[in-house]
Amino acid sequence: STKNGRDSNSKRLGVKVYGNQPVKAGGIMIRQRGLTFKPGISVSVGKDYTLFATQNGYVQFETINDKKFVSVVG
């Protein structure tokens, strides 16, 4: 018999809210493993590296020195 036949459940990672879309305070924007995206203005990091908004506004992605940042503006 084979030793294959197993598969893990998907972890539903990725970007949940894209650029210029509205987000509410506490809203999850990105689920990730490690800090692929770093927190910018009005964004905090959860213990599993989830990025979430700390205030209402619109999502903005930017790259600074080859690092990707996510901010909430206006």
Swiss-Prot record:
Name used for this protein in its record: Large ribosomal subunit protein bL27c
Subcellular location: Plastid, Chloroplast
GO molecular function, one term: structural constituent of ribosome
Gene of this entry: rpl27
Key words of the record: Chloroplast, Plastid, Ribonucleoprotein, Ribosomal protein
Keyword Protein transport: no
Family, as annotated: Belongs to the bacterial ribosomal protein bL27 family.
GO biological process, one term: translation
GO cellular component, as recorded: chloroplast; cytosolic large ribosomal subunit
Keyword Nuclease: no
Lineage: Eukaryota, Haptista, Haptophyta, Prymnesiophyceae, Coccosphaerales
Top-level taxon of the source organism: Eukaryota
